[in-house]
Amino acid sequence: MPDTNPIDIAAAWFRHATNRDTDAVMALAADAVEVGGARGSGTGRELLREWIDRSRAEMTPTRWFARGDLVVVEYEAVWRNRAGRDMGRRVMIVTFRVEDGRIAGIYRHDDLAASLTINGLDAGDAIEAPDAA
């Protein structure tokens, strides 16, 4: 039986996205997944696929927050050139909304406090990082 725990699903997303396993990322998403970020928002798995394919960043989760079907993760993104040299780093935030065991919404933010507030979470919703993250 597939895992339906929102935290485990978010951890799996990071694993698959960092390993560039786009098909595995797509298997976690609902057909009408909402995708939002700096470049706007939209709906659908193809939009998520384009986002993952375009990202090309190594993502290391640093802080996790969760309540119900929402998971907010602060992570460090690192971009490298073909030789493996560090081309830039940035702390980013992503929110996962999980429904019926699938990612129904994924939203990128630049500010952790704002992301927590928007989603009705706060510092009290901090959790230990999952083992698989």
Predicted feature residues:
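Short, aromatic-enriched amphipathic alpha-helices that serve as compact interaction elements
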Residues: P2-R20
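A beta-strand edge to alpha-helix "cap/lid" segment located at domain peripheries
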Residues: N5, I9, R49-A133
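A solvent-exposed, acidic/Ser-Thr-rich amphipathic alpha-helical stretch
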Residues: P2, T22-L70
